[in-house]
Amino acid sequence: MATEIDINRIQKDIFIEHKGEPYRVLDYEHVKPGKGQAFVRVKAKNMLTGNVTELTFKASDRIPLADFEQVYATYSYNDGENYYFMNTQTYDMIAVPKEKIEEEAKFLKEGMEVIVFLYKGQPIGIELPKHVELQVVETEPAFKGDTQAGGTKPAKLETGAVIQVPFFVKEGDIVKVDTRTGSYVERVKEAK
C-alpha cells in the first residue's frame, strides 16, 4: 500500500496517485467557501499522458503518494524517437520517449545532469536543473535606440529553443535560462 498524506499537507512538486495514475503537483489552492465544506484545488500533470488537469479534493481527504524512483543521470544523445541518459550509479542507458519530455528537451545539452523519473520501472519524465547556461546562436543585432526598458527580442539557443532576451544580448553570448518558465535570467558571458 502506498504512503498516504493528508490533503492539507500537499506541496508543489510532490507525486501523488489519483485513480491509479501518477501525477506531479504543479500548484494547489486551499478554498474555504462561505457556505459548504472547505476543499483543495490541485493543478497537476499526469506523468503518463503529459496532460495538465485540475483535481479537487475535500479538506478531509487523504491521498496516496505515487511510488516513484528518481535516478540521477547524464544526458547522452537522442535518435529522434528517444532521449538517452546514462545512470550515474550503474552506467546503464535509460531511453526516455520524446513525447514524455517535449518541453524539457528544448533545454537539454549533452553531458547535462538530470533526474529521470521511473514509475513501475518505466521512464516517464525528467527534471532539469533549475537554471542552464546556453549559447545564443542566432538573434537580431541591436540597433541604436533599442534601449527602451524591458524591451526584448527572440534569440535561438544552441539547443534549438527560442526565448525572449533583452536587446543587448548578441550572438555568441552565454545566457542563463530558467528551465521551469523558459525565460531569460541573465547574461553569463559576453561574446568577444
From Swiss-Prot:
GO terms for biological process: peptide biosynthetic process. Signal peptide: none annotated. One of its GO terms (cellular component) is cytoplasm. Keywords: Cytoplasm, Elongation factor, Protein biosynthesis. Pathway: Protein biosynthesis; polypeptide chain elongation. SMART domains: EFP (SM01185), Elong-fact-P_C (SM00841). GO terms for molecular function: translation elongation factor activity. It is found in: Cytoplasm. Its main location: cytoplasm. InterPro entries: Elong-fact-P_C, NA-bd_OB-fold, Rib_uL2_dom2, Transl_elong_fac_P/YeiP, Transl_elong_KOW-like, Transl_elong_P/YeiP_cen, Transl_elong_P/YeiP_CS, Transl_elongation_fac_P. Belongs to the elongation factor P family. HAMAP family: EF_P. Involved in peptide bond synthesis. Stimulates efficient translation and peptide-bond synthesis on native or reconstituted 70S ribosomes in vitro. Probably functions indirectly by altering the affinity of the ribosome for aminoacyl-tRNA, thus increasing their reactivity as acceptors for peptidyl transferase. This is Elongation factor P. It comes from Aquifex aeolicus (strain VF5).
